[in-house]
Design a protein with these regions (language model features):
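A short, active-site helix/loop in glycosyltransferases that binds the activated sugar's phosphate group
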Residues: 109-135, 145
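Nucleotide-activated donor-binding/catalytic signature segment of Leloir-type glycosyltransferases, i.e.
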Residues: 201-224
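Conserved acidic donor-binding segment of nucleotide-sugar-dependent glycosyltransferases
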Residues: 272-280, 289-294
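Short hydrophobic beta-strand element within catalytic cores of glycosyltransferases
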Residues: 255-258
Length: 327
């Protein structure tokens, strides 16, 4: 049995699913980073496959899902990010309207089944696209545990957030509020880890204080080191389909300070602090409040992720979704 695995960028969560599926089946990759593809080449790949598995409803999944439908082959589509979002106040999400809305809705409606990474994302695709609830299976992300037992002792007063730096993420990922909060808590070191994609880094430097460090792009090992080092992880987002970086940080023992946007409450549970909105003063106060958290609270953060989002749950969910379609 062969799966055609379709994606636009080979990011960490895509790689995880790819490897989990390869444990059981033959998987061929189809990567399309841009808008335009050769339909005949896509058609050849779909003909060879028994099932199409795609990540997000966008330009790269339009032809594979469409051809699968025409050839009466089953397809699975993972949704729950820009493709299902409608957040006009920050200009985010395909469901705001126009060509991208029509493209995403066409693709979503023609997939045989949908996978959402959170209950929030399931509700969002049902609400914004109008698909039936029973078409959507919730399969939470599985977070690989690369950290092991937490070391004893206090951590540095470091508040961490992880995001590519771009104009859209200034508001969506709460980067503006993060660096502004740093000015209100000068005794804390604020660290923004992520590649600079445009000149929005200049605005953040103007807004932030001297206690903000901008690392730029880092290796996986360097990112893991920051997770181990930080006391607090801040996710001041306006929309999150899951919040994988929060889960990774908690697995490393960071205490989360998050907004109630999207699936973030679903991820953190009763650990850390939840804020109604990305207010810099509230973020600064929350960071101060959890800085002194001891080993017991860090262990709770780690156990929350180990219990609810292990890799085995993702593996079982993907296998069940594929086998259901194959009959």
């Amino acid at each position: 049995m062969q799966i055609l695995f379709v994606y636009s960028r080979r990011v960490s969560f895509v790689e995880i699913d790819l490897e989990l599926l390869r444990e059981r089946w033959e998987v061929r990759e189809w990567a399309q980073p841009g808008r335009f593809a050769n339909p005949l080449a896509v058609l050849r790949e779909v003909r060879r496959a028994d099932i199409v598995f795609g990540w997000f409803a966008s330009w790269h999944t339009f032809w594979p899902i469409t051809f699968a439908r025409l050839l009466r082959k089953p397809s699975l589509l993972v949704v729950g990010g820009f493709d299902t979002a409608n957040v006009p106040e920050i200009g985010y999400g395909y469901q705001q309207g126009g060509t991208t809305r029509r493209l995403a809705q066409w693709t979503i409606r023609r997939a045989s089944r949908l996978i959402a990474n959170s209950h929030y994302s399931k509700g969002e695709v049902v609400r914004n696209v109008g698909v039936r609830e029973e078409k959507v299976r919730v399969v939470h992300h599985g977070v690989p545990d690369v950290f092991g037992a937490l070391p004893e002792g206090d951590r540095e007063p470091v508040a961490l957030t992880v995001s590519n730096v771009a104009w859209l993420s200034i508001e969506r990922k709460g980067l503006r509020a993060f660096v502004q909060a740093a000015r209100l808590a000068p005794e804390v070191r604020f660290v923004l880890v992520g590649q600079w994609l445009d000149r929005s880094i200049d605005l953040l430097r103007e807004l932030g204080g001297d206690n903000v460090e901008y690392t730029g792009r880092v290796s996986d090992d360097e990112l893991e080191a920051w997770y181990r080092r930080a006391s607090v992880y801040v996710q001041a987002s306006r929309h999150e389909g899951f919040g994988l970086a929060v889960a990774e940080a908690m697995l490393a023992g960071c205490i989360p300070v998050v907004t109630t946007a999207g699936a973030l409450p679903e991820v953190v549970g009763d650990v850390g602090v939840q804020l109604d909105r990305p207010d810099p003063e509230a973020i600064a106060d929350a960071v101060r409040a959890v800085l002194g958290a001891g080993g017991e609270e860090r262990a709770r953060a780690r156990e929350r992720i180990r219990e609810h989002f292990p890799l085995d749950v993702r593996r079982a969910g993907l296998v069940a979704a594929v086998e259901e379609l194959l009959g």
